[in-house]
Amino acid sequence: MQLSFILTSSVFILLLEFVKASVISNPFKPNGNLKFKRGGGHNVAWDYDNNVIRGVNLGGWFVLEPYMTPSLFEPFQNGNDQSGVPVDEYHWTQTLGKEAASRILQKHWSTWITEQDFKQISNLGLNFVRIPIGYWAFQLLDNDPYVQGQVQYLEKALGWARKNNIRVWIDLHGAPGSQNGFDNSGLRDSYNFQNGDNTQVTLNVLNTIFKKYGGNEYSDVVIGIELLNEPLGPVLNMDKLKQFFLDGYNSLRQTGSVTPVIIHDAFQVFGYWNNFLTVAEGQWNVVVDHHHYQVFSGGELSRNINDHISVACNWGWDAKKESHWNVAGEWSAALTDCAKWLNGVNRGARYEGAYDNAPYIGSCQPMLDISQWSDEHKTDTRRYIEAQLDAFEYTGGWVFWSWKTENAPEWSFQTLTYNGLFPQPVTDRQFPNQCGFH
């Protein structure tokens, strides 16, 4: 009897210790996702359950995009002839050569985003930035034309973020061979990320990022590392992509880091990733990044404003059902695809019927200058922004694309805010509860 009691007590104590240890290292959300991993002196500096991300992307800084900074690409244009204009950063650096490209980019990196931008971002009520960067900032392939030097500015940015109480995702925006063929991957119309050594090189680059920015030195600032921006699921091998995500996750955790791992949804439907990288499989602190745009097909562009808002609201309902934490890591105010070179150099706009066999909807001319927008378009834009904010804040929050552009107002947080179209404060609503969440 006594021996039985001692054994029972011992089992109970062991069970209690196991439960305590599990709770300390694996505090679960009700849906089975992990909130934090505590212990070992580590705390994640962001509570994805209870805090709402309100942020901007620092686009066009370390990865050039022709529509964001056309002034860097227009010198190659000959009148209306765009045939000599590089279509992406790869061809831009290749055309200029390393010396000239480096000189121009050093000036660009030191001026496009400065400490003053971080102060403004904070003063406007934002708490977060997502920083896109290409693999070439960390490792060059043989014969790559890219130039390096981005990392010193990335590290300045992390310091400016810390000083202004802003949290950061470091987002690997371009992989060798390109993961999507978009110009914002560095290399347009290429889909070779999964060929040759490209996936392994990407993992090597991620390992460098993990060791530099995934540890204690930046744990108060970096609240996520995004393994890869917008891998184009429909043209990639999804089994290989999942293995890449798993390898990236394991690589980060093997460094001892508790930093959340961010995976983009690869343009799959809501819920696709629910059973991948789960606590049940021993993976934790995983966030799914969804991007929300409604301008990259003729069908989307032809929607009226009520339809645009309905789609945005449904995003919120669908995202809420997912088992992982999720964030709208990119979105914009765009109701047209009119920004010059948005669809790529030497490509027109669907809105004008000048690209992708899309039907003509209207002229792009007034859309390029916010002072020429009609009152109706301004109202529609404000309504659309507010609906998206409501939808995204129904879950983990939002990261607007982008903080600034040279002359693409639908894509510039600064321009929209200073013209009264983006709410200020960001919680202000002229059109409250459009989605009926409350």
From Swiss-Prot:
Binding of human antimicrobial peptide LL-37 decreases the catalytic activity, which leads to the decrease of cell adhesion. Substrate binds at E65, Y67, E230, Y293, E300. Residues 22-38 form a propeptide. The active site is at E230 (proton donor), E330 (nucleophile). It is found in: Secreted, Cell wall. It comes from Candida albicans (strain SC5314 / ATCC MYA-2876). One of its GO terms (biological process) is glucan catabolic process. Gene3D superfamilies: Glycosidases. Keywords: Cell adhesion, Cell wall, Cell wall biogenesis/degradation, Cleavage on pair of basic residues, Disulfide bond, Glycosidase, Hydrolase, Secreted, Signal, Transferase, Virulence, Zymogen. InterPro entries: Glyco_hydro_5, Glyco_hydro_5_CS, Glycoside_hydrolase_SF, Glycosyl_hydrolase_5. The keyword Signal applies. This is Glucan 1,3-beta-glucosidase. Induction: Expression is maximal during the early rapid growth phase and increases during biofilm growth. Induced by caspofungin. Transcripts is also regulated by RCK2, SIT4, and HTG4. Its main location: secreted. Disruption phenotype: Leads to enhanced susceptibility to the commonly used antifungal, fluconazole, during biofilm growth only.
